[in-house]
């Protein structure tokens, strides 16, 4: 089929994004890294980060090789899968890993330069940190769109089975991206939080030395940063939303003719492409003045993200109108509902996690009565904070569904297909400005490490005050970014849920399985619609298979969190023992005359991350396969719904509780309730330490878990049908 000329905007946007990422990277590298001591600290961190990545990619490479052989056997041996799946799976993982590598590399080069720029002014420090974060944001969208464009062109040339086959095949590279993202997020979270928790317990609580003090042997491993896995995480959300919406578009507009169907398929790709250019505009708008307050800093970032969001909303109307898609106006409002949901969730997260607002201030106040009340208050705040995001996502789902199908509540096959396409379009809308929203997220670890470098390099009080301001902002932007990632994951997972039915349809058609439609007539699977499938597989709440699947899905979220939390705990115990040993055996560390063995702590974190990440990550792959083989399609749909509902709510709770504990401690360090060294400060350090794996390991990993279970179900649909 002929690809419309307007499609080529997609690869052009990807090249522009990658070119601008390279430009921002070179601009950052031209900045001075500072004093010899600052360069030395940065080199330690860089070596630790690269050692971790090298080990992680070895482990992930083995897992990918095993899965690729399995998919090749399913495709060419059992003939229950499209023959392109093994290759799509590999490219998804490769590009996702590449995004993570560039993000980590940029972050480790940017931290010392940010600290050095902060010696000049707050604005100079903000610009370097934020534009270094933009390198990751633009790399993710650039590589994502490039991968999508290449596969669309290749499959359009070689796959003659039509757009539904092409788009569902493209979806499978999302599983490669999801697998890589989960390993990166879980492994990176265990690595950095084992070091962080260990450094806090022995350094701040026992030895009473400040955070990021060079006398603490674990401080270098801690400063490798939370950026590990962040790029890979949102890469798979971004690709998943675009690809699932393209697949839903092919299904929804299949009866309208090939040309209309093709326009519906490329619409989400074009919205994402235009989002690249508007994200760039927002990035250039971010700046601040010397002596800026936390609210001023937040406002400067909000200007960039909000301008990009407003412009993409306007651009969507033009794109859908010019494509001539039926009900273009309703679909445009679906996009706006997704964008609005992203903004509202971000603002709600900021309210519950920034120490400019009451919830976090109350946690700081609770520190006056001890660590127990800090923990209780933080858990309560995290639980209450789930209310607004859950309601917001619920409203966004309903609005995007109804706007896309013309407010048709009949649940006919046509209105259902168009409504589901609207939900997918809403997810694309939320992620269309990822270039700038991921920049604000990645900015957090860079600012954090800049503060660590300033502390370890003994820079002046004024510089440390500036890096503290950037770091506190980074905690809030990181929490806001996590809220955004969780919200987009929920919409993407729902779109993937609908795409699963399309993949089952293709698998049944390939296996020549006949079925009964709603009227009781025997028809081929190729002629069936979504209501027919729901009836055929008895997908309703009275079917015990659906209920059992839903319970397993909800349990999987808690099981996964429990395993990752325990992994951090075990690794942190080893780190605590090592730091205590060094304090005991290496003379002069606490006096500042002896040099700690930083490398040993980096080695402990690296080894723990590689060992501990395997079981939770593999579990996420195995559960949907077992449920599919035992409980069938109805059980899998229950599993995905239960995993989505439980995982989304739990992820919001963990991210917000962790962010609130962190900023409650920062609030006291700025002078509230007795300041540094006070009883309240020590109580809040305990809360912050508990919150570390909440917000940086288990919580963010849940986003990937709920999407990976959907992706695995889609890829394994042929196997599920074979066991019917």
Residue ranges and their predicted role:
Residues 1-724:
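Hydrophobic packing and interface segments
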């Amino acid at each position: 089929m002929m690809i419309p000329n307007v499609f080529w905007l997609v690869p052009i946007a990807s090249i522009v994004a990658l070119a601008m990422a390279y430009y921002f990277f070179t601009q950052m590298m031209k900045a001075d890294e500072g004093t010899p001591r600052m360069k030395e600290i940065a080199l330690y961190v860089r070596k630790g980060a690269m050692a971790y990545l090298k080990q992680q990619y070895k482990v992930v490479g083995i897992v990918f090789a095993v899965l690729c052989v399995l998919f090749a056997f399913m495709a060419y041996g059992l003939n229950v899968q499209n023959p392109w799946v093994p290759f799509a799976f590999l490219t998804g993982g490769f590009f996702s890993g590449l995004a993570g590598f560039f993000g980590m590399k940029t972050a480790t080069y940017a931290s010392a330069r940010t600290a050095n720029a902060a010696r000049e002014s707050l604005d100079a420090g903000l610009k370097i940190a934020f534009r270094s974060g933009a390198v990751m944001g633009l790399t993710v969208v650039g590589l994502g769109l490039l991968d999508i464009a290449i596969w669309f062109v290749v499959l359009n040339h070689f796959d003659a089975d039509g757009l539904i086959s092409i788009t569902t095949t493209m979806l499978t590279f999302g599983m490669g991206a999801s697998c890589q993202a989960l390993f990166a997020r879980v492994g990176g979270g265990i690595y950095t939080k084992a070091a962080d928790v260990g450094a806090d317990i022995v350094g701040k609580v026992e030895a009473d030395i400040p955070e990021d003090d060079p006398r603490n042997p674990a401080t270098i491993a801690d400063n490798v940063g939370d950026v590990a896995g962040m790029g890979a995480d949102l890469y798979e959300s971004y690709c998943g939303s675009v690809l699932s919406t393209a697949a839903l578009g092919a299904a929804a507009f299949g009866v309208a003719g090939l040309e209309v169907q093709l326009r519906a398929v490329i619409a989400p790709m074009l919205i994402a492409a235009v989002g690249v250019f508007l994200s760039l505009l927002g990035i250039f708008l971010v700046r601040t003045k010397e002596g800026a307050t936390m609210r001023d800093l937040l406002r400067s970032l909000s200007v960039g993200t909000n301008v990009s969001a407003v412009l993409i909303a306007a651009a969507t109307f033009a794109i859908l109108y010019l494509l001539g898609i039926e009900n273009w106006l309703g679909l445009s409002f679906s996009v706006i509902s997704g964008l609005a949901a992203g903004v509202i969730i971000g603002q709600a997260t900021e309210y519950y996690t920034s120490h400019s607002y009451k919830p976090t201030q109350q946690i700081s106040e609770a520190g006056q009565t001890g660590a127990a009340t800090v923990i209780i208050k933080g858990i309560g705040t995290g639980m209450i904070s789930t209310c607004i995001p859950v309601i917001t996502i619920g409203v966004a789902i309903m609005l995007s569904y109804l706007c896309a199908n013309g407010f048709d509540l009949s649940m006919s096959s046509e209105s259902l297909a168009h409504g589901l396409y609207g939900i997918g379009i809403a997810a694309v809308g939320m992620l269309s400005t990822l270039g700038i929203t991921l920049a604000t997220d990645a900015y957090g670890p860079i600012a954090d490490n800049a503060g660590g470098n300033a502390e370890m390099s003994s820079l002046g009080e004024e510089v440390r005050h500036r890096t503290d301001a950037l770091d506190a902002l980074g905690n809030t932007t990181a929490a806001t970014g996590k809220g955004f990632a969780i919200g987009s994951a929920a919409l993407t997972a729902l779109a993937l849920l609908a795409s699963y039915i399309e993949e089952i349809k293709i698998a049944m058609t390939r296996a020549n399985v006949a079925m009964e439609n709603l009227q009781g007539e025997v028809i081929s699977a190729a002629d069936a619609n979504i209501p027919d499938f729901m009836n055929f597989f008895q997908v309703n709440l009275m079917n015990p298979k659906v209920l059992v699947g839903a319970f397993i899905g909800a349990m999987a979220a808690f099981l996964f969190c429990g395993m990752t939390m325990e992994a951090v705990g075990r690794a942190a115990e080893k780190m605590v023992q090592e730091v205590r040993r060094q304090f005991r055996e290496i003379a002069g560390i606490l006096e500042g005359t002896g040099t700690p063995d930083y490398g040993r702590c980096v080695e402990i974190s690296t080894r723990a991350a590689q060992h501990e990440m395997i079981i939770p990550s593999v579990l996420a792959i195995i559960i949907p396969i077992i449920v599919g083989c035992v409980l069938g399609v109805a059980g899998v749909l229950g599993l995905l719904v239960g995993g989505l509902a439980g995982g989304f709510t739990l992820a919001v709770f963990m991210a917000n509780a962790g962010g609130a504990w962190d900023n409650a401690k920062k609030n006291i360090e700025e002078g509230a309730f007795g300041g540094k060294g006070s009883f309240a400060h020590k109580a809040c350090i305990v809360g912050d330490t508990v919150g570390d794996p909440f917000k940086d390991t288990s919580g963010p990993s849940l986003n990937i878990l709920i999407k990976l279970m959907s992706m695995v179900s889609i890829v394994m649909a042929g196997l599920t049908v074979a066991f019917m």
